[in-house]
């Protein structure tokens, strides 16, 4: 068969399938299936965009094969589709093949009055893409010609138009709808126009960028209001708004995406004690977690995974978004307690001591906190070097009762309640605090001997009428004058207080220093 006459011009924005249907309507007035049989083209090959089928159609139509190939959606490797320079999955194609803009079809009829209607109606490529829901030229929503007909039983386009009652009836059914910002980005990307999505989107496929924008925007706008399952019920208008929101974020690059993840996490952080990734990041995490490992979602997965590891207490060996966690980055109060083999109360006191937790924080609020693993190394080191009360007494050169008194007065901060120390053999006191206490007292003290009017700390406490631990606290506060360091002694047994200072304090001590003994 030679070149068909009359020649039918190819519209660059229509699909190869649409052109073949128009060619059949012009030259035979019959069905596309019988027309393709006459040309020796298998319908399934043309639907799949097979190079041989497209080339044969271009040959008989007198078209440049490359021009027609640019309008064909081709199957690639069984998992992907290609269109022009874009690659995407079948999920990016609308399952409704018969979506049209009635106003565009009316324009087609008006422009080609000499052609039969079936030869003038052009099915636009953009109508096949899932994010496209409205016509930017006419400001109306796309109309589904056969919403109740399964895809496999879909009649040919001409028959669908007859079922719908023609173009005029379709125009009456169309509703005003402006295209969303994300749809306009898809149009520009597909047509090869300058990409204003920024470098973060520019490095992604059209599907990766569009899906990331939609889901990120949906979680930002509706994540707090919808349960995870109800996102399927979002309306077309809600998805349009979500896509626009996500696009604005994506245009700001990776930094803006991370800031959006901060917002999502902050909104959901109070919903549960130590909520996992699904509770914290909602739809965004669910979408990425259950996505096929063979379908790369693009850099949004990396950004979310890094955000999870930087903010949630994830155990080494756990799998997060398809990758095993090699090293812990964050600790929760619970996981840290388990690692240190302490109670959660002891751990919280340790975190307060190293400045990682504010004092007096309610237990529920404390359980929601997460701490950088490197930051809590100070606490880990303190626990590793901690000693028992008896060992602390030996290191300080005092009695166990005096160590307990120092804890009662707040001079030492144990890992367990000081009220329990007499009944426990647990590691309770960080050794570095003991050394720091002795060093501070030595720096404050002047050397003296027992004959210079100086009392040992225990005797000075009795004279001043305060417990031993409170006396040491008063010395550290400078309220008993300069202490003395008695020669030939070690540890706290060398601590001395001027007798005159103890007498003066006894006669004028404020009531708030009276501590029951």
Describe the residue ranges of each PLM region:
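Intrinsically disordered, low-complexity regulatory/linker segments
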Residues: 1-517
